[in-house]
Structure formats: C-alpha cells, structure tokens
C-alpha cells in the first residue's frame, strides 16, 4: 500500500517508473528521438556565421528572423532557457541577428532590446563567446579578447590545464577558438548595436 510506504520506498518506486518510461521510449538501436529545445543563440549565431561566410539564403534568414522575433519577451529581451531571466549576451546576439534579417533599429521591438542592452552594461558586459562573434563581425576588437594560444594542444596529458582533461565539448570549442583567434578574422557586417 502506498500510504504504508516509506519516503525511500516512494522515491525508489518513482525512480523505477521514470526509468521504465524512458526505456519504453528508447528505440531498439539504443537511441531516443525527441525535440531538442534551445534558445535563440543557435539561430542568431547561424545568421552571424552565414553573414561572415557570405552564405545568404533569404528563406533561412526570414525563418530565423521569425523564430527569434517570436521568442522576444515583452521587455525586449531574450532568455537563455524557457522561463529564465533576461540574458544580456543572448539579447545582444538576437538583436544583431534581427538587424541582419532586416529589422530596422528604430522598430519598437528593436529599440526595447537596444535600450535594455545599454541599461545592463552594453556589449562590454557580454560573455566572451558573444564578443568573439562581435569581433568576427567587425564590432569588437580582437585586442580586447583573451588570447588562447593554439600551441596549447601540444601540452602533454600530465601537464596541468592540458586539453585532454577537459570535456570533449570544451576541447572542441577551445581548440577551434584558439585557431580562429590566432588569425583574428573580421568581416564587418555594416550594422551596429548603437
């Protein structure tokens, strides 16, 4: 009987039901299929990368712009996760992506975003990854970013801070950014956040 069960037994039962539910959703080959929800930075960074590479696709730009606009909150910001607080870096990237999508800076939703960005420290207060996107877009100086020497990959596994002690996602990110940062490329996008 449930009313006679101890808290530990109730927790154990809940855990087993959750496990069984997940195993029931697993495909025979061992994988799960489901929706992956993310924030607007993936779409914003995709548009920034496409602009950097010169890969203009009006349909993709329009779709990304619609998605980013649909996730903007009433105060002009975007969050990092559903229901989360406003995030400065996410808002800066979304704003720039919408400018690339053709949104005018004096449009009410853009003015709200820009004013919020300014009130919360501006681009100077964004995370390093956002400032790297800004540098690639000619909106931030590479001189004002941390330097990660690509030679870092040569450090042996026994050395402190060697890349083999990092998670695979961190290793891929840091090595790629170290290489890009050593070249310091910039392709001005002809817009600003001001």
Which sequence ranges carry the predicted segments?
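Preference for long, amphipathic alpha-helical scaffolds in soluble/luminal domains
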Residues: 1-194
